[in-house]
């Protein structure tokens, strides 16, 4: 074996030891190194390959030490053209990404390469993507509400500033739209910094998101990191860590409050499952990797608030076949401060966001944190909706006429509440033709208190559809009466 000197990703040059490829199985590559020169776990290795039309550098991440100077690595790019005997050099450090203001307004891949401006950030500061979570004595003990202006969220499943929020739902119920709405609201209302991680989702969605953010003028405050559906599992497994590293810099060095959006955390788990099988690990329940809980914990424990600064994470979580007992969503539940469950039946009723008010939860929905009035109104809304749910079987079999008079009143009130929990989104303006509404929390509590007391039972149910505040409801009712 020979020693070589290699460029260290634009961060200066370092002595790098050369190994050689001994086996290639899809994205998993075994590499042999000289005795005493075996690279550390998570180090990035570089392999130069030449295809008929182009020469390129593959990045391999060390995943296992096999013994006899062999390491098993996972490739971050397709391994087409990689053959046994190809020289591999150790960079001496983990995969590193650019950090700081330079990443705002740009699109990166999991390796930290800028996709819209090639080479951007490589001559500046870079951080490795494998980092330890903040020390226990550095964590923030204070609990604050993150006000979103979305009624159903602020009232029934309030988000924690510096917390972890899960958006659960099957395919097509509105997870990505809700994330796009949150990015827009945070940028417009709070002038905050956002980092978006596209993990294993459709390339088209990434393009749409970039164009929409550009149109709305919020791109300059957001860093986008993509490892999409067509990427190898190694990239999909690491892209969330790359985005989180950028967010940590804004929190720890610049002292900013950051929002980290991950779409979709299920694809992170799925990529880990693919890699685990190729690495020869025995599968666990439903075919998932045996290290599922550890991998999820390593990611989630880094998303937290430190003294005076926070990373608030909003994670879209695809639920396979709408089965919440699947190990992927079930493992994520343990780390979350709030869960927003998107319901297909509510979506089919045309109520957006299609949040299920009865199954969505928040650990801060208690009087000591949100206040006695907020807690009382939220519980009254849930009580009315729960009673309506219990009566639905009777209504379906016998009809409304068989209900007692007080139950008829309650059903009408519940339907008004159900419709009033929806509202127009800013990102949907071009589709609906209606301006998006931002409702202050104080107004939300007062409005639902009045609706629960029956002050608006005389207005038609349809007047409550996609309205912001009660003024919008009354205006819609007058318009309907005029027709």
Swiss-Prot record:
It is found in: Cell membrane. It is an enzyme of class 7 (translocase). Its EC number is 7.1.2.2. It is a peripheral membrane protein. It comes from the Bacteria. The keyword Cell membrane applies. Keywords: ATP synthesis, ATP-binding, Cell membrane, CF(1), Hydrogen ion transport, Ion transport, Membrane, Nucleotide-binding, Translocase, Transport. SMART domains: AAA. One of its GO terms (molecular function) is ATP binding. Pfam families: ATP-synt_ab, ATP-synt_ab_N, ATP-synt_VA_C. PANTHER family: ATP SYNTHASE, ATP SYNTHASE SUBUNIT BETA, MITOCHONDRIAL. Belongs to the ATPase alpha/beta chains family. Produces ATP from ADP in the presence of a proton gradient across the membrane. The catalytic sites are hosted primarily by the beta subunits. F-type ATPases have 2 components, CF(1) - the catalytic core - and CF(0) - the membrane proton channel. CF(1) has five subunits: alpha(3), beta(3), gamma(1), delta(1), epsilon(1). CF(0) has three main subunits: a(1), b(2) and c(9-12). The alpha and beta chains form an alternating ring which encloses part of the gamma chain. CF(1) is attached to CF(0) by a central stalk formed by the gamma and epsilon chains, while a peripheral stalk is formed by the delta and b chains. NCBIfam families: atpD. HAMAP family: ATP_synth_beta_bact (MF_01347). This is ATP synthase subunit beta. It comes from Rhodococcus erythropolis (strain PR4 / NBRC 100887). The lineage of its organism: Bacteria, Bacillati, Actinomycetota, Actinomycetes, Mycobacteriales.
